[in-house]
């Protein structure tokens, strides 16, 4: 589970929709809130109504300062943890069984009668222990969170780097296996297709069974397949192993943002997601720079060996240092430990009550990201914009060598201009970090989460992005007249636009679908990666056939046409979320 509350005096508290005022008052007695004038706000999630208790704007400043401990207090309520489990397992509409019924049960055996009913299960159900429970990820020491973030970011960088480092192997693959360039590029396409497909499986599984198990499995399989590619004897094996390396290794693309949402409240979440976004974009851009040096001095196989060694180190780091962040799974582990220590088998967590068959898992959870993508207009249109931008990133992997190697005659170090892209991304990340303060001010003003306020930075970046594309492509179109530094500087503007569109999109999706953040991000990753897989296939033909300048004009016009997307969501986003079946807050 993740931070699940619009900002109020002490963070919003998720209550079942049938909760009465008296139950709300009981909750107040736990210390989660202690003032009057509470107004309920309804929102929907997975087909059922929920209620959040929010305060007036007067307490909003206090909320910004004290949100870290409030969700722990809210999750100390049995009804809340039980409701959250129903959301994550897709069993919201299934009634709670409150009476013992032995009608269809097998005999106890030994001619024994059926046992009497147990006391209320609420007495045996574990929750978090108030606002300062050290088990709750919001209350973990910052040093611990930083370490976990470092491990998660390295995991994300490993998979992102591997997606594009194969571009440095393409010339050798063409020469050794006697294939044309578009066939060799399939090594990139199949890998990205692999990590387009699997996050829609990994994300729901992480919401059922926790983040760590999914990440460990993914990191281990990813490392193995990198060594398999490096030792492959033929092209078919290379391509098959590249696909499965991407498929198995893609868990970080959906699970890492959800893990960040598990650990950080509204004050810090946006800044933490910025680190993940840098890894997602800097990895594919930095890897050709590194890959060109490796490929020029050794063979293409060492590209895969290097990634495999890096992935192995990340796997060890996850096993040794990563701690489970998924809130319901933490309570499951707490219940297991208490049962072992006390020998009281009745102690349990709400997440253990739901038993799902393979069929249930597929129908209720694994299909959820795809269903969300196509029934949620908010998620669909933001994802289309995000996917187009991500596809541009992989187009640039083809355009840069055409401009700087074929145009300007760079023989070695032809990938160094990529660094301008990275500089632009870092500048944009710093800008969005600054804009996060503006976002928190808007939350204070409304007294709740305002996901649309994340999009103001995207309006600016969306304008800079087509300018950067046109700058880079048209100045790079005349290498004999214009110095190579001019298109290089244009690349910095492209980098600013890439990061400035991707990061607000990701934050917007997470905060709009907070309880189902992993599934929403997986849906986004599915389409985004599909674009990233397809774009390189036609990149060379487009840039060579149309010319760098005219191809850039086409891309720039597409990018300019999408500038209104964040403006539309700024105006209509809140009303769309109110009608949503899955959105968190309205």
UniProtKB/Swiss-Prot annotation:
Induction: By transcription factor PDR1, by transcription factor HAA1 in response to acetaldehyde accumulation and by the non-steroidal anti-inflammatory drug indomethacin.
Alphabetically ordered keywords of this record: Antiport, Cell membrane, Membrane, Phosphoprotein, Transmembrane, Transmembrane helix, Transport
Topology in the lipid bilayer: Multi-pass membrane protein
Transmembrane feature ranges: 146-166, 182-202, 213-233, 243-263, 272-292, 302-322, 377-397, 415-435, 455-475, 484-504, 506-526, 529-549, 550-570
GO biological process terms on file: cellular response to oxidative stress; polyamine transmembrane transport; putrescine transport; spermidine transport; spermine transport; transmembrane transport
Consequence of changing residue 19 to A: Reduces transport activity
UniProt family annotation: Belongs to the major facilitator superfamily. DHA1 family. Polyamines/proton antiporter (TC 2.A.1.2.16) subfamily.
Function: Cell membrane polyamine/proton antiporter, involved in the detoxification of excess polyamines in the cytoplasm. Catalyzes polyamine uptake at alkaline pH and excretion at acidic pH. Recognizes spermidine, spermine and putrescine, the polyamine analogs methylglyoxal bis(guanylhydrazone) (MGBG) and paraquat, the antimalarial drug quinidine, and cycloheximide. Confers resistance to the non-steroidal anti-inflammatory drug indomethacin.
Other remarks in the entry: Present with 1470 molecules/cell in log phase SD medium.
Annotated protein name in UniProt: Polyamine transporter 1
Gene name for this UniProt entry: TPO1
């Amino acid at each position: 589970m993740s931070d699940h509350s619009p900002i109020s005096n002490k963070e919003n508290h998720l209550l079942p929709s049938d909760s009465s005022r008296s139950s709300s008052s009981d909750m107040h007695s736990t210390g989660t809130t202690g003032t009057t004038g509470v107004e309920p706000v309804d929102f929907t999630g997975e087909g059922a109504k929920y209620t959040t208790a929010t305060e007036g704007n007067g307490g909003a400043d206090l909320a910004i300062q004290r949100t870290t401990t409030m969700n722990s207090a809210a999750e100390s309520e049995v009804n809340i943890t039980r409701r959250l489990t129903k959301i994550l397992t897709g069993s919201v509409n299934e009634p709670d069984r409150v009476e013992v019924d032995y009608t269809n049960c097998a005999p106890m055996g030994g001619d024994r009668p059926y046992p009497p009913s147990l006391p209320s299960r609420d007495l045996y159900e574990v929750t978090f222990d108030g606002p300062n429970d050290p088990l709750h990820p919001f209350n973990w020491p910052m040093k611990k969170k930083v370490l976990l973030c470092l491990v998660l970011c390295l995991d994300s960088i490993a998979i992102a780097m591997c997606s594009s480092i194969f571009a440095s192997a393409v010339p050798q693959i063409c020469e050794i296996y006697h294939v044309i360039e578009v066939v060799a590029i399939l090594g990139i396409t199949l890998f990205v297709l692999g990590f387009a497909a699997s996050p829609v499986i990994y994300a729901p599984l992480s919401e059922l069974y926790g983040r760590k198990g999914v990440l460990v499995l993914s990191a281990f399989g990813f490392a193995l397949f990198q060594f398999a590619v490096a030792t492959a004897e033929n092209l078919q094996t290379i391509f098959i192993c590249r696909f499965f390396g991407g498929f198995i290794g893609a868990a970080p693309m959906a699970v890492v943002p959800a893990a960040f949402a598990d650990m950080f409240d509204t004050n810090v979440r946006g800044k933490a997601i910025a680190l993940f976004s840098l890894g997602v974009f800097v990895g594919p851009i930095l890897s050709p720079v590194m890959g060109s040096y490796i490929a020029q001095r050794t063979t293409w196989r060492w590209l895969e060996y290097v990634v495999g060694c890096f992935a192995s180190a990340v796997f060890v780091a996850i096993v040794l240092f990563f701690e489970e962040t998924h809130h319901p799974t933490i309570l499951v582990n707490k219940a297991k430990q208490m049962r072992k220590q006390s020998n009281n088998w009745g102690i349990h967590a709400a997440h253990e009550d739901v038993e799902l068959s393979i069929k249930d898992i597929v129908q209720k959870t694994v299909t959820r990201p795809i269903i969300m993508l196509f029934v949620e207009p908010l998620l669909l249109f933001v994802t289309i914009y995000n996917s187009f931008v991500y596809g541009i990133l992989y187009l640039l992997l083809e355009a840069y060598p055409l401009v700087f190697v074929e145009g300007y005659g760079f023989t070695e170090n032809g990938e160094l201009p990529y660094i301008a892209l990275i500089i632009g991304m870092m500048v944009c990340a710093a800008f969005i970090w600054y804009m996060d303060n503006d976002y928190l001010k808007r939350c204070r003003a409304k007294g709740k989460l305002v996901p649309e306020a994340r999009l103001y930075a995207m309006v600016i970046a969306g304008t800079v992005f087509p300018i950067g594309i046109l700058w880079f492509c048209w100045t790079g179109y005349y290498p004999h007249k214009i110095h190579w530094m001019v298109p290089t500087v244009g690349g910095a503007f492209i980098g600013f636009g890439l990061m400035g569109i991707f990061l607000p999109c990701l934050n917007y999706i997470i905060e709009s679908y907070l309880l189902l953040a992993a599934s929403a991000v997986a849906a986004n990753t599915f389409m985004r990666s599909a674009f990233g897989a397809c774009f390189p296939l036609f990149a060379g033909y487009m840039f060579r056939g149309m010319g760098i300048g005219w191809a850039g004009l086409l891309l720039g016009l597409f990018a300019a046409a999408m500038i209104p997307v964040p403006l539309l969501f700024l105006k209509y986003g809140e009303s769309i979320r109110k009608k949503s079946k899955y959105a968190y807050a309205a």
